[in-house]
């Protein structure tokens, strides 16, 4: 995501510091301390401007949401939305998703959302796709058996490629569709999703569940 740099970014970020976690690695194994009564802990990777994040958090106040975004110009908009809505169940991480496994204990997250990530269409950039096996292994590390990923995109080639990666890495695929909103809008839409849907672009979605056969990241991979 490319956004225009804003001169007032730092003071705006500072005003949102109560819902931003500055040292997420220190929270591994302790995320529920932010909301002990939480029914679930969910993570959104690449939350962008936060429409999906805040609307889902508002709809499910008994769930703790952790939103990750490395583009600060986008994340500040998401945080400001959360504060304006008075949400107490969503926190933000200013970081790259590639560091996810270092920030969560094994099995600490119940569900991970991947919404409209960059498709990186060129083959030489495949490793940057958020459904590349090295990312899937980290998600599996943070999820318990039966935990899952909800993946949405408007990019059919990326979706089909991702289905192959999920299957090859031992994930169980469920509720796979190449036209999610064919019979009417389902669930909370992202900002991008609303635009694509209005243009008649089919939205692809699937759920991938962690099984005993799912490949899982190990800390030794960092040392290799």
Segment roles from a protein language model:
Residues 48:
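Conserved glycine-rich SAM-binding loop
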Residues 45, 68:
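Conserved beta-strand/loop positions that form the S-adenosyl-L-methionine
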Residues 164, 169-224:
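Class I S-adenosyl-L-methionine
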Residues 71:
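Conserved SAM/SAH-binding beta-strand->alpha-helix loop
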Residues 1-43, 51-58, 79-106:
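S-adenosyl-L-methionine
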Residues 131-145:
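A short glycine-rich, Lys/Arg-flanked "PGG" loop and its adjoining helix->strand segment in the class I
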Residues 146-153:
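Conserved beta-strand signature within the Rossmann-like core of class I S-adenosyl-L-methionine
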